[in-house]
Amino acid sequence: MDVMSSSLQQQRVVVEQLRREAAIDRQTISESCAKMMKYITEHEQEDYLLTGFTSQKVNPFREKSSCTVL
C-alpha cells in the first residue's frame, strides 16, 4: 500500500508541474524574433563587439603588462 501511495504522490507532483508549464504564456517565433531584432538595433551602439573600445585602457580583455623583478 505504501508503494501505491508513493506512486500516487509522484504522479500528483508531475501533474502539478505540467499544469504550471501549460500556464506559461507562449509567443510565436516571429514575435520573439521581431522583439530581439528591435532590441539589438536599439542597443547596437552599446555593443563593444560591434563598435570596439574607445581606448585600450577600458578594454578588460587586453593583455596585462607583467612586472618582472630580478
Swiss-Prot record:
<comment type="function">
    <text>Guanine nucleotide-binding proteins (G proteins) are involved as a modulator or transducer in various transmembrane signaling systems. The beta and gamma chains are required for the GTPase activity, for replacement of GDP by GTP, and for G protein-effector interaction.</text>
</comment>
<comment type="similarity">
    <text>Belongs to the G protein gamma family.</text>
</comment>
<dbReference type="GO" id="GO:0055059">
    <property type="term" value="P:asymmetric neuroblast division"/>
</dbReference>
<dbReference type="Pfam" id="PF00631">
    <property type="entry name" value="G-gamma"/>
</dbReference>
<feature type="modified residue" description="Cysteine methyl ester">
    <location>
        <position position="67"/>
    </location>
</feature>
<dbReference type="InterPro" id="IPR015898">
    <property type="entry name" value="G-protein_gamma-like_dom"/>
</dbReference>
<dbReference type="GO" id="GO:0035050">
    <property type="term" value="P:embryonic heart tube development"/>
</dbReference>
<dbReference type="GO" id="GO:0007637">
    <property type="term" value="P:proboscis extension reflex"/>
</dbReference>
<dbReference type="GO" id="GO:0045176">
    <property type="term" value="P:apical protein localization"/>
</dbReference>
<dbReference type="GO" id="GO:0007391">
    <property type="term" value="P:dorsal closure"/>
</dbReference>
<keyword id="KW-0636">Prenylation</keyword>
<dbReference type="GO" id="GO:0043519">
    <property type="term" value="P:regulation of myosin II filament organization"/>
</dbReference>
<keyword id="KW-0488">Methylation</keyword>
<keyword id="KW-0807">Transducer</keyword>
<dbReference type="InterPro" id="IPR001770">
    <property type="entry name" value="Gprotein-gamma"/>
</dbReference>
<dbReference type="GO" id="GO:0031681">
    <property type="term" value="F:G-protein beta-subunit binding"/>
</dbReference>
<dbReference type="InterPro" id="IPR036284">
    <property type="entry name" value="GGL_sf"/>
</dbReference>
<dbReference type="GO" id="GO:0010470">
    <property type="term" value="P:regulation of gastrulation"/>
</dbReference>
<comment type="subunit">
    <text>G proteins are composed of 3 units, alpha, beta and gamma.</text>
</comment>
<keyword id="KW-1003">Cell membrane</keyword>
<keyword id="KW-0472">Membrane</keyword>
<feature type="propeptide" description="Removed in mature form">
    <location>
        <begin position="68"/>
        <end position="70"/>
    </location>
</feature>
<dbReference type="GO" id="GO:0003015">
    <property type="term" value="P:heart process"/>
</dbReference>
<dbReference type="GO" id="GO:0048383">
    <property type="term" value="P:mesectoderm development"/>
</dbReference>
<dbReference type="GO" id="GO:0007186">
    <property type="term" value="P:G protein-coupled receptor signaling pathway"/>
</dbReference>
<dbReference type="GO" id="GO:0061343">
    <property type="term" value="P:cell adhesion involved in heart morphogenesis"/>
</dbReference>
<dbReference type="GO" id="GO:0060027">
    <property type="term" value="P:convergent extension involved in gastrulation"/>
</dbReference>
<protein>
    <recommendedName>
        <fullName>Guanine nucleotide-binding protein subunit gamma-1</fullName>
    </recommendedName>
</protein>
<feature type="lipid moiety-binding region" description="S-geranylgeranyl cysteine">
    <location>
        <position position="67"/>
    </location>
</feature>
<dbReference type="GO" id="GO:0003380">
    <property type="term" value="P:establishment or maintenance of cytoskeleton polarity involved in gastrulation"/>
</dbReference>
<keyword id="KW-0449">Lipoprotein</keyword>
<dbReference type="GO" id="GO:0005834">
    <property type="term" value="C:heterotrimeric G-protein complex"/>
</dbReference>
